Design a protein with these regions (language model features):
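Conserved N-terminal diphosphate/IPP-binding helix and adjacent helical/loop segment
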Residues: 1-110, 163-181, 242-243, 334-344
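A glycine-biased, small/acidic residue-tolerant capping/turn segment at secondary-structure junctions
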Residues: 5, 12-13, 234-244, 271-278, ...
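All-alpha helical catalytic cores of prenyl diphosphate-utilizing isoprenoid enzymes
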Residues: 4-18, 26-36, 116-127, 131-238
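Active-site alpha-helical segments that house and flank conserved acidic catalytic motifs
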Residues: 54-82, 150-158, 193-196, 201-204, ...
Length: 344
């Protein structure tokens, strides 16, 4: 990413813009690059060669991912991302050094830090778009690539919107009931498309695969995307905070609607007990109690079972798919196995 990151800060930019974008560049470095890998794999499946022409698209997508995570961090009021302080949090701390006693300072500080995060994310979106246009100006599949890319952005935004409103309704408007189908819709829009199906589709489109072939392969990968998110939800509660790069309690504090939560409140007698802790800052003892509730209610076991079923479904569909060359099937199956055993 360093090759592209260094171009994100324009020497002619205002010093305030340079400061903000330097934080974006820092956040845009040292990711897992799973989505870039899937773009490369999709391209190899289609083009059957490695001429590196997929690299700008992969870099653009990783930049889009960072941009949308910056927005996500503002929405969730998150403090840590990828093991680093979030951009808006860095500005909170920077402004705190002003040590002002004005009664309006705290509100203004938070509003300004969050606004900077939104601006930086917006800039990141269009940097990503520019990278695609400038790199593939004369490519015959540019229009199709942009259409797919924009569909991914739109679907991710829709998933994020549901993910924002659902917890609010669940916490404050009791007539609305969070059901598993709502959770699955978020997983499909916000994770499956954005993390698995979208990147692989972009690579295949760039490489020249037909719509029929792309549709058959994305069908095989859709269950994988949902399994990926369920794994994330489990790691978010039971994983190592250092490995996952965020606090274990963040899903609880943010009242996140996960499969663990949905199962517990809709299928067990632990609904009221869980709701005593959800949406609150928890002590270690209280957080361990939430973990225990998910276990004794059967939610943890249910989530694992559902996740493993989806991993197996994706494996079977990949193996049966005649449009994926054997060599790339083996790589895809290895990738699925990695997602199964990952701890971050």
């Amino acid at each position: 990413m360093n090759k592209w990151n260094k171009n994100f800060i324009n020497k002619k930019d205002n010093v305030l813009v340079k400061d903000a974008m330097s934080k974006f560049v820092f956040m845009n470095s040292n990711g897992k690059y799973l989505r870039a890998l899937l773009i490369a794999l999709g391209y190899f499946i289609a083009a059957k060669n490695d001429d590196n022409s997929y690299l700008p698209l992969a870099a653009a997508y990783e930049t889009f991912q960072t941009a949308i995570l910056v927005h996500d961090d503002v929405i969730d009021n998150a403090e840590i991302r990828r093991g680093k302080k979030t951009i808006h949090k860095k500005y909170f701390e920077k402004f705190d050094k002003y040590d002002l006693k004005d009664s309006s300072f705290e509100e203004k500080k938070n509003n300004t830090g969050n606004s900077i995060g939104i601006c930086v994310g917006d800039i990141g979106f269009y940097i990503s778009n520019n990278m695609i246009v400038e790199s593939y100006m004369n490519h015959p599949n540019l229009a199709k690539v942009l259409k797919c890319y924009n569909d991914i952005v739109i679907n991710t935004g829709k998933g994020e919107l549901i993910d924002v409103v659902l917890p609010f309704n669940e916490q404050y408007y009791s007539k609305n009931k969070c059901l598993e189908k709502d959770i699955m819709e978020i997983y499909n829009l916000k994770t499956s498309w954005y993390t698995i199906v979208g990147p692989c589709s972009l690579g295949m489109i760039l490489g020249g695969n037909s719509e029929r072939v792309i549709e058959s392969i994305t069908k095989a990968l859709s269950p994988l995307g949902i399994a990926f998110q369920i794994k994330d939800d489990i790691l978010g509660i039971y994983g190592n905070a250092k490995n996952i790069g965020k606090s274990n309690t963040s899903d609880i504090t943010e009242y996140k609607q996960t499969i663990l939560y949905s199962y517990t409140v809709n299928n067990t007698e632990y609904k009221e007990e869980l709701k005593k802790y959800y949406g609150k800052s928890l002590s270690e003892k209280e957080f361990n109690k939430v973990r225990e509730i998910f276990e004794v209610s059967g939610a943890k076991n249910y989530a694992y079972t559902k996740m493993n079923e989806l991993f197996e479904e994706s494996k079977k569909l990949v193996i049966k798919n005649r449009n994926i060359p054997t060599y790339y099937k083996e790589i895809l199956l290895g990738f699925i196995r990695y997602l199964e055993i990952r701890d971050n």
